From Swiss-Prot:
SUPFAM superfamilies: P-loop containing nucleoside triphosphate hydrolases. Belongs to the DnaA family. HdA subfamily. Mediates the interaction of DNA replication initiator protein DnaA with DNA polymerase subunit beta sliding clamp (dnaN). Stimulates hydrolysis of ATP-DnaA to ADP-DnaA, rendering DnaA inactive for reinitiation, a process called regulatory inhibition of DnaA or RIDA. The active form seems to be an ADP-bound monomer. Forms the RIDA complex (regulatory inactivation of DnaA) of ATP-DnaA, ADP-Hda and the DNA-loaded beta sliding clamp (dnaN). GO terms for biological process: DNA replication; DNA replication initiation; negative regulation of DNA-templated DNA replication initiation. HAMAP family: Hda. Keywords: DNA replication, DNA replication inhibitor. It comes from the Bacteria. This is DnaA regulatory inactivator Hda.
């Protein structure tokens, strides 16, 4: 999926961002987060602006939900923007200029700009412009609540503390298994429970790692024309 973010630099450049095709609302397993999922879906489908901030220490689905929101609106022909601030070395703060004209703006990993005066001011100004226009949905993620971000600009921390704020609750091991099985089902194959529990026991339990491993096993299964079993998984993953 291609999402184009406008960079209002003197050269009027545009920056294409490729987001995962499989990170949609349908593939998100909510676990104990149905209220957050419902709030984001509601915001996406409302014709007016809104602001939601959600955070978690572990990551665990923050980017997935932003990607899903972008996918939902971009498929409807709306202009959306996704800015991963953990990769801000590839951007300039001016990337945020003009984003209040978009239907949706997603800011990922805002904790990464703490202490960066230029980025903090650019984010503060964008927030104010979005509030003034009243048309743009704004979704922001962080690794902690807004007041704990150690931002150098107190007014930005104050702004981020307005609106709807959620903690993204981590999945239990049983929920991670169900999330893996859901992802497998959407990709057209079955993940047996014993294989899923084996993966949870032997691998890093971080969901992105688990999903990447699931993709690897899917490809290997197709190539070898074999179903997923524990012996086959051990062979492919050298466990």
């Amino acid at each position: 999926m291609l999402v184009e973010v406008l960079l209002n630099t003197p050269a009027q450049l545009s920056l294409p961002l490729y987001l995962p095709d499989d990170e949609t609302f349908a593939s998100f397993y909510p676990g104990e987060n149905p209220s957050l999922l419902a709030a984001i879906q509601s915001a996406v489908h409302q014709p007016h602006g809104s602001y939601i901030y959600f955070w978690s220490r572990e990551g665990g689905g923050r980017s997935h939900l932003l990607h899903a929101a972008c996918a939902e609106l971009s498929q409807q022909g709306e202009a959306v923007g996704y800015v991963p601030l953990d990769k801000r070395a590839y951007f300039i703060p001016e990337v945020l200029e003009g984003m209040e004209q978009l239907a949706l703006v997603c800011i990922d990993n805002i904790e990464c700009i703490a202490g960066d005066e230029q980025w903090e001011m650019a984010m503060f100004n964008l927030y104010n412009r979005i509030v003034e226009t009243g048309r743009t949905r704004l979704l922001i993620t962080g690794d902690r609540p807004p007041r704990q971000l150690n931002l150098g600009l107190p007014d930005l921390a104050s702004r981020l503390d307005w609106g709807q704020i959620y903690k993204l609750q981590p999945l239990s091991d049983d929920e991670k298994l169900q999330a893996l099985q859901l992802r497998a089902k959407l990709r057209g194959f079955e993940l047996p429970e014993d294989v899923g529990r084996f993966l949870l026991k032997r691998l890093d339990r971080e969901m992105r790692t688990l999903f990447m491993t699931l993709d690897q096993l899917d490809r290997a299964s197709i190539t070898a024309q074999r179903k997923l079993t524990i012996p086959f998984v051990k062979e492919i993953l050298s466990l």
